[in-house]
Amino acid sequence: MADAAPAGDAPPNAGAPAGEGGDGEIVGGPHNPQQIAAQKRLQQTQAQVDEVVDIMRTNVEKVLERDSKLSELDDRADALQQGASQFEQQAGKLKRKFWLQNLKMMIIMGVIGLVVVGIIANKLGLIGGEQPPQYQYPPQYMQPPPPPPQQPAGGQSSLVDAAGAGDGAGAGGSAGAGDHGGV
């Protein structure tokens, strides 16, 4: 610097720390412009180094934080995988259980259906040893009597004549007995 030295023997940088001048300059040595420029570059480089060190510290802290979060995520993923495996096993067991229940229900419904069809078929006479009931005449109508059996000639003609005499058919014998029964 171009300041004049104060009066006395004291150097101009007497209050500065040892090794540096009052303006941050190095004490002892010529103060030419090259040294001043070199010193400024050194200070700028030192500031840049300090800035890079701070950035690196921040980055290292972030990397450590990221690592802890990644390990936590890995633990969660393992727990989730284990839970998914257990869920899959339980779902398989439940599926088999309900499949068996469904199968049992289908078998029961099939047996019930067969029993109902069998009962209906039995009532309709489609199966079983019994014949369906034949048509019966209503009570007000009488079914015609079956024709009397044929009698041999000679031995019992008196009974036939007595039965036939009430009809007014005359004495026709056994030949006329079967002719008037179907009216």
Swiss-Prot record:
Biased segments, Low complexity type: 1-17
Vesicular side of membrane: 128-183
Positions of the v-SNARE coiled-coil homology domain: 41-101
Cellular-component GO terms for this entry: early endosome membrane; plasma membrane; SNARE complex; synapse; synaptic vesicle; synaptic vesicle membrane; terminal bouton
Disruption phenotype: Embryos develop normally, but their nerve terminals do not release transmitter in response to an action potential. Spontaneous neurotransmitter release is reduced, but not abolished. Slow degeneration in adult photoreceptor neurons is also observed: defects are caused by an accumulation of endosomal vesicles, leading to transmembrane protein degradation defects and a secondary increase in autophagy.
Subunit structure: Part of the SNARE core complex containing Snap25 and syntaxin.
Function: Involved in the targeting and/or fusion of transport vesicles to their target membrane. Major SNARE protein of synaptic vesicles which mediates fusion of synaptic vesicles to release neurotransmitters. Essential for fast vesicular exocytosis and activity-dependent neurotransmitter release as well as fast endocytosis that mediates rapid reuse of synaptic vesicles. Also involved in a neuron-specific sort-and-degrade mechanism that promotes endolysosomal degradation and is required for neuronal maintenance.
Protein name (record): Neuronal synaptobrevin
